[in-house]
Every structure is written in structure tokens, then in C-alpha cells.
UniProtKB/Swiss-Prot annotation:
This is Histone-lysine N-methyltransferase ATX3. InterPro entries: ATX3/4/5_ePHD, ATX3/4/5_PHD, EPHD, Hist-Lys_N-MeTrfase_ATX, Histone_Mod_Regulator, Post-SET_dom, PWWP_dom, SAND-like_dom_sf. Residues 54-63 have a biased composition (Low complexity). Residues 39-150 are annotated as: Disordered. Histone methyltransferase. The keyword Secreted does not apply. SUPFAM superfamilies: FYVE/PHD zinc finger, SET domain, Tudor/PWWP/MBT. GO terms for molecular function: histone methyltransferase activity; zinc ion binding. Residues 875-993 form the SET domain.
Length: 1018
């Protein structure tokens, strides 16, 4: 084996041993043999001897015996004067001195060493006449402008190279390397190095590799910026795989120069010395050119003289099959089966898997068609016409022009020829346009024909929208980006993909050159807005329930922020959400739209009818409070009264042309999702359960509110969703508000018993429950076990009446007038007398006259409505055996959604008294019925109250409770309202809304058996 120190890459050289008796005899005395390499003559016009800065010239004759002895004696002694000997494991090798070439490349003391250095060092070059380029930011790999790069010896150099080009391929010694710290830039692919994985890890022999073509995918995924990829010699502990690493500055050292320092390491970090010795021997063989199992295929591996004629693949014909080819993209050598031909590539072009992916993603130069490689340096420019990247050098872009392109448009040569938009023509057009801007503005066409992806459309300058001519869109107007997607174009750049049909000029250029007016900066006026609202639409008629606030959709209310209900349209809102003063009489309150019932009010921002409407500063235009909240340009002049709404004319006009994804209509102004371009009306999103958030923050001493709406794709809609408020103190929603503000939540009823079992809890069988009693014991002394035979039966309603042969609906029709007139004694007595004495025909006539003359009039206040509810409650509800727990409340007749059912009555006590009563009821084993209506007032219906206390809890209720204020200093009342349509005989339930408690000890189990049961009421 012959070991050369000056090789920086893997190289197979034909070395010839010099047979000089005197030199060999002297070397044997020192334990060394000096090998001389026969010098070859240069065969090019400018030999390497003419580059004194690059390569040291060598002598053509051998030195004398005395000179060689002096050189060898200087090299064989260390700084202490000791004679260096070859390690025992290299006794069968022909080895020179370890440090004979450490700094000899820079000195000219020995002519023999100069010969070794001059012939051993290599420079990076090209087989063509291209000039080498390398930027300062290059980490590991040199710049390659084509795929024919190779490493050649100076003796076979066939290209004229300058001084800078020659130094490019050689690692430059920096100040840091002189101090023992080497940068990754100083090493190239194929260099043998000592690499360390950490400060406490040993230095291990390794080779620098190309991570793209030589490293596994797992190594490439964990790429570290500013580091080089190395492959360690030797095998891992399983003995089958190689180890790879990304090494940074200070953890990599030249192999030859640090051989003496690292070959005698003792701390190998759990590695065996035998493994280290095998790796070292493998590295020594690799430096000599004998790779063995460690041979790797490198795109930058050196080419021999024969390789220049037959290509890189000819080097592997001896050990590989004949179907080995090189990738035309990166130059990697691999089997032909793993190479692919892409649709966009040339017929004879073969690409590897990695390069084919880059080709499909347009990661290649549009001029030279060279695929982008991580090792490539230089500048790239993206064409604004076709979205293709181009080498700056390929288009002869200077550094000054490259800086100017950051603020200007760039077009590749193909786009320049196709559209004739050279920079000089653009400058002339801009100059002409500036001079004639005022004269051409008035003569602009209102519409122009545009084309994209083979589909035509009409661009309307007034609305900055495009009307498609495909036939299926009709008269629908779309924004340029939407129409671009509609045509099937994937460029996502409508400014350049949408072009004017006549001149094929990009639409953005046409707008910039012939119009200074865009719709984004256009200010609307009343006439234009009314013209946008004149189009026909289908009104969305919504059911406004009193369960939730029509603005924030919360179900909770508080003493200082009560839920109020309009006496006419039955719309429920919070006082703060609608701007209602606390001094107003809430029993006869009507909303702003119902103050003038003869005039119909509609929102100008959405097609939804009714709701919480507020007037704007424009006469005749009204808006929903929710629409004004989530429209950034709209606000309220008075935040306390929440009116009037201002900023309607600041809304972009193109928002009135968007199609709502929920109601499928264009009437009104649409908002879009904060994550994508999905458009919808704010009120439609609120009714559909979309996630809506208000972010309140303070910036520079100014209170700011940011609104966010999420579409159904980015957040799953929920019918019970509410407006979530984000503040610096926390996030407030419908359920977690109970955790953040104790004592301010809506009142709830607590029902507890001693023997509560979790749903699904399996009790013992009767065989296990049966006890073995003494045969002589009395029956009254035995423990009584309750029978469970009727637990799973359906709910049964109890009606106080005798036997009946008629259906329930027939009986309800006969007694319907009683519910309307509720025990009016004079009329009822007359009716009974007439029914007993007159004929049936006269009886029906009198009943009809009575119903017509005594119809239920509209209530002027909530107090009157509540009195009527108390008189007729026995005709609406009854009690019965519940299928949930104990006794329950049942509907005696069919009840419509939103209809008031019954008032929850009891004794009003303070909070402290209610706590004492609850403890007393528990000690007696009684069920307690407590309903909290405010922070200090609780209604106790345990001993005194009406039938409403029997209503049970359900996670899917058909009723909800509403706390209403009577005004004039009177106490609040609790009313149960139907949430859905309830059939006669159906059990009435509502959600208790207990305060959420995380402790398992005081959890109250839920027995409702609903599909969405929460298992616990709290």
C-alpha cells in the first residue's frame, strides 16, 4: 500500500517506485522509504509551471544523495529530536512521514516534496470553456452551471484558467484554520477529515459527501444550516449500516495533518478500540484510492484521462452492470431503472427521483434548463409573466440591475418576445401615459373583453369585477382572483394570467397604464349604494328566539346586564349588546325597529329579516348590530346607545358583489374568513353557528378591537356557538364564563338526593342482593329491598279526569275556550246554564259568539302577559311519573316554539338563608328545589311553590328558563319558554346550567339519557 498525504479527493493514481539504492538504504536506517513520483510533461499550451502562485514547479532531475539524506533526516525527527517510526499495524505498508506534506505545499525547501504537491493537488474546473463562479455564501459545494464538471490533474488541463479561477477549487487557509479551527467552507466533497459529533465525543475518520445524492433521506431531512455532511468510516454497532452526521465549524479537521493527534485517542465514548482501528485502516486505504466497501458514488468525484472520453459512467463498468447511467440534473451515477423521464424534459434526458420532483415543481432555470441544486450558488430571478425562475447569469443581469429588480417587474426572454414588453418600451409607455393621463381618463371603456386559460369574460371597470361568458355563470360578477380559479388556471396571479383579448396585455398593466381609478380606493355614496341594493333577492326569514341574545348569542344574563325581550317582535337582547338604558321600563320595552311598526326595516348589509336592528347615519338605511360589529369599516358613533352606525360609505364596493357561501345570495356586504377567502354575511355566519371572536387589546394607550370569523373548513360550526371575547384578563365564552366570574352567572336550580348513582352504573343482581336470613327471624326485622321492576318504563303523565272514550285531541278542542277565558265566572255560569237548557244548535252559536267577542287582546306590557300565564297554566301542563328522575312536568297540550309555558314560583330568600335551608333539607333526606335568579336572591320551591318545580334536567332540553324584570323596583320573575315544538303528553325539560366544578367529590350525575349527555350536570 502507498499512502499519499496531499490528496484532497478520492483519486486513483499510477505511482511508480523509484529504485535509487542510496535513498532506499538511507530510508531503511530510519525505518522509512521515500517514494518519488515520476514527473509527467504537460501537453497543453500553457503548462502548470507558468502558474507559480497556484502550483509549485518541480525539478526535472533527481537530487543528489547528500541533499536527499538531509531532507529525510529533517522530516523523520520530531520537535524533541525523536525518530518517528511507522505504527505496528502498518508494518506491511510503504509509508512516508505523516507530516511531510503539512506545510510543504507552501514552501520550496525540498524539490521532491514540491513534486508531490504539484502533482497531488487538484483544482475544480470544467471540461468546457465556462468560467467558474462561487459566491461568498457558498457552504460546501462549488457553483456548477452545467452537468459536465469534473476534477482533472494539471497535466491534463485543457482549458485556460486565470489565477482566481484556479484558486477557486483549492481550500483557502483562513486565520481560524491556522489556530486549529477549520470552517466547513474549506472542505469539498471527497475530502478525508476527522469529525466530532460533540465536544466530549472522539474524533472519528470520515469523508465529506454530497447529501443530495449520497446521503439517505433520513439524513437529508435533518439538514443543519452551515454544516457539512460526512460519512464515518467503519460500521455502526449492528455491523450493516454506515453512520452520517452534520458537522459544524470547529468539529472537523484535515485527516492527514491531525493523524498524530487523533490516532492514539483513549476516550472513545463507549466505542471499542478495535472498531476505531478498523475505521482508521479503512480511511488510510481510502486516502490511497482503495475504497473497498466504503466507496461511494459522488457527482464531484475526479475524472481520469479515460473518463474524459467515455464519461463518468465508464469508471464503473468494471464493478457495475452496463445499465448504469448518470442523472442529467445533478450528475449522480445510479442504475438506469431508478432514472425517470418527465413530460417537460427532453427525450434523451434522464433524471433521478429527486431531480424529477424539482422539475415538476418548476425548480429549474428557464433558460439553461438546469435543475436547481442546493449546492448551486448565484442569484435567481422569478419571471413575472410565466412564474419561472432564471439564473441571473443566464440573462446577463448585472448586480446593479439585480438590485433594481427588487422593486420592478422582470420578464424572461420568452415573455419579452411573446408580449413585447421590454423595459425600454415600458418606460416609453409610462412616460406617454403620464403626459396623457388626464385626457384619456374620460375616454376609458366601461367594459373590456379579457381572456384567461382559454375562457373569455368581460371586465367591468366600475366594479372591478369580471362577468364570465361560459354560459353557466349567467350575469354573476366575480373578482379577478375568483374568475381565475373559475377558469381552471393555477397560476394564482390574476394580474398576469388574466389578459386583455385584443392586445394580450396583462390586466394589471392595462389598469395601471390606462386608469388611475380602482375600486379599492373608490368612495361610495348613497346613490351608488342604493343601486347596489336594488337587485332582487330572496329574504331570509329567521326565527328569533328569546333563549339567546340576538347579538352575542349568549344564554346567560346578569343583574347589571339583563336579557330583555321586545314586546312586539319577541327579539331578546342584552342591555349592553343593544345599548338599552337601565332606567327604561323593561316590561313594555320595544326595539328600535318596532317603534314604527308601520314601516318595515331591513338590514342593508345582509338579506336576513328582523333581528336586532339599529339606524345608521344615512337616512333609510338600517344595519344589524352583528353586521356592524364584524364589518371593519362600520362603527357606532355612541357606544353606550349603540347608534347611529357610521362608515357605510367606506365599505369596498366589491364586497357587495360577493356571493355568500351560506345563503347563496349577493345582497348586502360580505365578510371573509380570517384564514381564507371564503365570503359570507356576518348575520348568516352567526345563525349558522360559525366561530366569531372579538379580540380586545390596548395599543399605545388606545383601546382596539379586532374581529375574527372562521369558515366551516377552519373551525367546525356549532349551533350553540357564541361570540367569544378575548381580553388581557382571559377568554370569555358561554361555558367558561362560569369559571371566570363566580356569582355573576345565570341562576340555576340544584336537585340533590342522598342515593344518586352514576348513569350506566351496574348494581348487583338480585341473587347477590338476597341475604341469608335466619329462618326464625321475623319479617319486620329483615331489611327491605326496593324493587327495580318499573325503573325502565316510559314516562307517564297523570291527568285528573274520569274514564274517556274520546281521543286527547277531541277533548282539547272541547275545552280550548277555557284556556282562553280562564275561569271568568259570570260567562261560564251563563254558558253552563245555556248548555243545559237550549238545544245543541243554539249552544254552538253562543259559543262562537263568545269566542269572537272575547278574543285575547295583545298585551301592552309583560306584567299583563305574566298574569294571563298564571291563570292558564293548569291548561298547559300537568305532572306525571318521569322517565328521568322521580316526578316530572308534562305538556297537557301542544305547545309551539317560543311560547311561554309556566312561571317558576316559590319563596324568595337570601343566598345565605338558601345555603342553610339546603343543608337542612339534606339532613332530612328531602329533595331541594332552589333557583338562583341573582347574586343575592334565590327562589326556594321545596315546601311552597307551583308545579313548575317538578321540571327535570336534560342535556337536550325542549325548554329554557328566562329571568325577566318586572320594572318599577319589583323583583325578577322566572319563566319557562318552549325551545322546540312540544307535543301533548311529552315531558318538559330544560338545562339547569350548573356552575362547572372540576372536583369529582361534588359532581352531580345526569340521568337524562340523551344522545349528547354530558354525564354530569356540573
Amino acid at each position: 500500500m502507498i499512502l499519499k498525504r496531499t490528496l484532497t479527493t478520492f483519486e486513483n493514481q499510477n505511482l511508480k517506485r523509484c529504485k535509487i539504492d542510496s535513498e532506499i538504504e538511507y530510508g531503511r536506517k530510519k525505518g522509512e522509504i521515500i517514494v518519488y513520483k515520476k514527473r509527467q510533461r504537460a501537453t497543453v499550451d500553457q503548462p502548470c509551471s507558468k502558474e507559480p502562485e497556484l502550483l509549485t514547479s518541480s525539478s526535472s532531475s533527481l537530487t543528489s544523495k547528500e541533499e536527499s539524506q538531509q531532507v529525510c533526516s529533517d522530516q523523520s525527527k520530531s520537535s524533541r529530536g525523536r525518530v518517528r517510526a511507522v505504527p505496528s499495524r502498518f508494518k506491511d505498508s510503504i509509508v512516508g512521514t505523516w507530516k511531510s506534506s503539512r506545510r510543504k505545499g507552501e514552501s520550496t525547501e525540498s524539490s521532491h516534496d514540491d513534486d508531490d504537491v504539484s502533482l497531488g493537488k487538484k483544482v475544480k474546473g470544467f471540461s468546457g470553456s465556462s468560467k467558474l463562479h462561487r459566491s461568498k455564501d457558498s457552504k460546501v459545494f462549488p457553483r456548477k452551471d452545467n452537468g459536465d464538471s469534473s476534477e482533472v490533474d494539471c497535466d491534463y488541463w485543457d482549458v485556460q484558467i486565470s489565477y482566481d479561477d484556479a484558486n477557486f477549487g483549492m481550500p483557502k487557509k483562513s486565520d481560524a484554520s491556522r489556530k486549529g479551527v477549520y470552517k466547513p467552507e474549506e472542505f469539498t466533497v471527497g475530502d478525508l477529515v476527522w469529525a466530532k459529533c460533540g465536544k466530549r465525543f472522539p474524533a472519528w475518520p470520515a469523508v465529506v459527501i454530497d447529501p443530495i445524492s449520497q446521503a439517505p433521506d433520513g439524513v437529508l431531512k435533518h439538514c443543519v444550516p452551515g454544516a457539512i455532511c460526512v460519512m464515518f468510516f467503519g460500521y455502526s454497532k449492528d455491523g450493516t449500516q454506515r453512520d452520517y452526521a452534520w458537522v459544524r465549524q470547529g468539529m472537523v479537521y484535515p485527516f492527514t495533518e491531525f493523524m498524530d493527534k487523533f490516532q492514539d485517542q483513549t476516550n472513545l465514548f463507549n466505542y471499542k478500540a478495535s472498531e476505531f482501528n478498523k475505521a482508521l485502516e479503512e480511511a488510510v486505504l481510502a486516502e490511497n484510492g482503495n475504497f473497498g466497501d466504503a466507496e461511494i458514488i459522488s457527482p464531484d468525484s475526479s475524472a481520469t484521462e479515460s473518463d474524459q472520453d467515455y464519461g463518468p459512467a465508464s469508471r464503473f463498468q468494471g464493478s457495475y452492470h452496463e445499465d448504469i447511467r448518470t442523472c442529467d440534473g445533478c450528475g449522480s451515477v445510479m442504475p438506469l431503472k431508478s432514472l425517470k423521464r418527465t413530460k417537460d424534459s427532453q427525450p434523451e434526458e434522464l433524471l433521478c427521483k429527486h431531480c424529477s420532483k424539482l422539475r415538476k415543481s418548476n425548480q429549474y432555470c428557464g433558460i439553461c434548463k438546469r435543475i436547481w441544486h442546493p449546492s448551486d450558488d448565484g442569484d435567481w430571478v422569478c419571471c413575472d409573466g410565466c412564474d419561472v425562475w432564471v439564473h441571473a447569469e443566464c440573462d446577463n443581469i448585472t448586480n446593479e440591475r439585480f438590485k433594481e429588480l427588487e422593486h420592478n417587474n422582470y420578464y424572461c426572454p420568452d415573455c419579452k418576445v411573446q408580449h413585447e414588453l421590454t423595459p425600454t418600451i415600458l418606460e416609453e409607455q409610462n412616460s406617454v401615459f403620464k403626459s396623457t393621463e388626464k385626457t384619456t381618463e374620460t375616454g376609458l371603456p366601461d367594459a373590456i373583453t379579457v381572456v384567461c386559460n382559454g375562457m373569455e369574460g368581460t371586465y367591468i371597470r366600475k366594479f372591478h369585477a369580471i362577468e364570465c361568458k361560459c354560459g353557466s355563470c349567467g350575469s354573476r360578477k366575480q373578482s379577478p382572483s375568483e374568475w381565475e380559479r373559475h377558469t381552471g388556471c393555477r397560476a394564482k396571479k390574476w394580474k398576469y394570467s388574466v389578459r386583455v383579448k385584443d392586445t394580450m396585455l396583462p390586466l394589471e398593466k392595462w389598469i395601471a397604464e390606462f386608469s388611475t381609478y380602482t375600486l379599492e380606493t373608490q368612495m361610495l355614496d348613497k346613490q351608488k349604494m342604493l343601486s347596489l341594493l336594488e337587485e332582487k333577492y330572496e329574504p331570509v326569514r329567521a326565527k328569533w328566539t328569546t333563549e339567546r341574545c340576538a347579538v352575542c348569542r349568549w344564554v346567560e344574563d346578569w343583574e347589571e346586564n339583563k336579557m330583555i325581550i321586545c314586546n312586539r317582535c319577541q327579539v331578546a337582547v342584552h342591555q349592553e349588546c343593544y345599548g338599552v338604558s337601565k332606567s327604561q321600563d323593561l316590561t313594555s320595552w320595544v326595539c328600535r325597529a318596532c317603534e314604527t311598526p308601520d314601516i318595515e326595516r331591513d338590514c342593508c348589509l345582509c338579506p336576513v329579516k328582523g333581528g336586532a336592528l339599529k339606524p345608521s347615519d344615512v337616512e333609510g338605511l338600517w344595519v344589524h348590530v352583528t353586521c356592524a360589529w364584524f364589518r371593519p369599516e362600520v362603527g357606532f358613533l355612541n357606544h353606550e346607545n349603540m347608534e347611529p352606525a357610521v362608515g357605510l360609505f367606506k365599505i369596498p364596493a366589491n364586497s357587495f358583489l360577493k356571493v355568500c357561501t351560506i345563503c347563496k345570495q349577493t345582497h348586502g356586504s360580505c365578510v371573509h374568513c380570517c384564514k381564507c377567502a371564503t365570503h359570507f354575511h356576518a348575520m348568516c355566519a352567526s345563525r349558522a353557528g360559525y366561530n366569531m371572536e372579538l379580540h380586545c387589546l390596548e395599543k399605545n394607550g388606545v383601546q382596539r378591537t379586532r374581529k375574527s370569523v372562521y369558515c366551516s373548513f377552519h373551525r367546525k360550526p356549532d349551533p350553540d356557538s357564541v361570540v367569544v371575547v378575548h381580553t388581557p384578563s382571559g377568554v370569555f365564552g358561554s361555558r367558561n364564563l362560569l369559571q371566570n366570574q363566580y356569582g355573576r352567572a345565570k341562576g340555576s336550580r340544584l336537585v340533590l338526593t342522598k342515593k344518586m348513582k352514576l348513569p350506566g352504573f351496574q348494581t348487583q343482581t338480585q341473587a347477590e342482593q338476597s341475604r341469608v336470613f335466619d329462618s326464625l327471624s321475623a319479617a319486620r326485622c329483615r331489611i327491605y329491598s326496593r324493587s327495580n321492576t318499573k325503573i325502565d318504563l316510559e314516562a307517564i303523565s297523570h291527568r285528573l279526569k274520569g274514564p274517556s272514550h274520546h281521543s286527547l285531541s277531541a277533548i282539547e278542542n272541547l275545552n280550548s275556550f277555557k284556556a282562553s277565558f280562564s275561569f271568568r265566572a259570570p260567562f261560564m255560569s251563563v254558558f253552563c246554564f245555556l248548555g243545559a237548557t237550549f238545544s245543541e244548535y243554539l249552544r254552538k252559536i253562543l259559543i262562537s259568539i263568545y269566542l269572537v267577542t272575547h278574543q285575547e287582546a295583545d298585551f301592552t306590557s309583560f306584567r299583563e302577559r305574566l298574569k294571563h300565564l298564571q291563570r292558564t297554566e293548569n291548561f298547559r301542563v300537568c305532572f306525571g311519573k318521569s322517565g328521568i328522575h322521580g316526578w316530572g312536568l308534562f305538556a297537557r297540550k301542544s305547545i309551539q316554539e317560543g311560547e311561554m309555558i309556566i312561571e317558576y314560583r316559590g319563596v324568595k330568600v337570601r343566598r345565605s338563608v338558601a345555603d342553610l335551608r339546603e343543608a337542612n333539607y339534606r339532613s332530612q333526606g328531602k329533595d331541594c328545589y332552589l333557583f338562583k335568579i341573582s347574586e343575592e336572591i334565590v327562589i326556594d320551591a321545596t315546601d311552597s311553590g307551583n308545579i313548575a318545580r317538578l321540571i327535570n334536567h336534560s342535556c337536550m332540553p325542549n325548554c329554557y328558563a328566562r329571568i325577566v324584570s318586572m320594572g318599577d323596583g319589583e323583583d325578577n320573575r322566572i319563566v319557562l319558554i318552549a325551545k322546540t315544538n312540544v307535543a301533548a303528553g311529552e315531558e318538559l325539560t330544560y338545562d339547569y346550567l350548573f356552575e362547572v366544578d372540576e372536583s369529582e367529590e361534588i359532581k352531580v350525575p345526569c340521568l337524562c339519557k340523551a344522545p349528547n349527555c354530558r354525564k354530569f350536570m356540573n
